[in-house]
């Protein structure tokens, strides 16, 4: 099992509403995530912190089976996908945490060694720190 930090942009998608309504979210699968991997969801500005702990419930979901989440999109142009695209489903496994101790600066202080420009693996030190906030 691997642990990952994925980003969610609230200026492009109503992530909090979607997770509240469905208990999961689907992403275009670009990383080698596998079922059972842990996902920490980092919410970008204005929050700038980890707010969700999730598990990969399903990977390699074909486009035809992916959920239509377009009503939650805030983008002016709809996303376009091709038939070969696959998606991954992250299911919540803990309640949302709204704590500024999970900001990027604090993650760096606890072993995270990356920028927030893309989704990244999480080492044990960082995972233990993040996990301490989730019950």
Predicted regions and their residues:
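Short, basic/aromatic beta-hairpin or loop at an interaction surface
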Residues: 5-21
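Short beta-strand-centered aromatic/proline hotspots
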Residues: 49-59
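Residues that form ligand- and interface-recognition hot spots within folded domains
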Residues: 10, 43, 60
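Contiguous surface segments at macromolecular interaction interfaces
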Residues: 1-6, 22-28, 64-135
